[in-house]
Amino acid sequence: MKVIEGGFPAPNAKIAIVISRFNSFINESLLSGAIDTLKRHGQVSEDNITVVRCPGAVELPLVAQRVAKTGKYDAIVSLGTVIRGGTPHFDYVCSECNKGLAQVSLEYSLPVAFGVLTVDTIDQAIERAGTKAGNKGAEAALSALEMINVLSEIDS
């Protein structure tokens, strides 16, 4: 029986990080975690990491699609934070962001790691951006690295 499982090192990988500016006080911690993980665990050089900023989570899928369309990248890490408010807006933003990023991944057969926090409170966001609950940006970067290697193994 053959088992395909990807590791984390991907020293030649080219990674795009698409990140929303809205809630940047959280997102910058996610970005730091993602970059640190790509460099330490993935052995990815800083020259092979591109950061693309956009206004908010709703814009992430379009930016990810344009990045994927270039064919220059082996994976995309998406980062952002959506915090529930008093209206249904939260549900729409989270749903469309998630669906759009998944669509880009399937359309371009490219790993698009989901590092978008969808939380009820600012405290929950802070916990997931490098304190009690780890750093979800780092986790998304690990997912992207692993998927690069899994897909490479499948194709070989």
Swiss-Prot record:
Pathway: Cofactor biosynthesis; riboflavin biosynthesis; riboflavin from 2-hydroxy-3-oxobutyl phosphate and 5-amino-6-(D-ribitylamino)uracil: step 1/2. GO terms for molecular function: 6,7-dimethyl-8-ribityllumazine synthase activity. 5-amino-6-(D-ribitylamino)uracil binds at residues 22, 57-59, 81-83, 114. The active site is at 89 (proton donor). SUPFAM superfamilies: Lumazine synthase. One of its GO terms (cellular component) is cytosol. (2S)-2-hydroxy-3-oxobutyl phosphate binds at residues 86-87, 128. Its EC number is 2.5.1.78. Catalyzes the formation of 6,7-dimethyl-8-ribityllumazine by condensation of 5-amino-6-(D-ribitylamino)uracil with 3,4-dihydroxy-2-butanone 4-phosphate. This is the penultimate step in the biosynthesis of riboflavin. This is 6,7-dimethyl-8-ribityllumazine synthase. It comes from Vibrio campbellii (strain ATCC BAA-1116). The lineage of its organism: Bacteria, Pseudomonadati, Pseudomonadota, Gammaproteobacteria, Vibrionales.
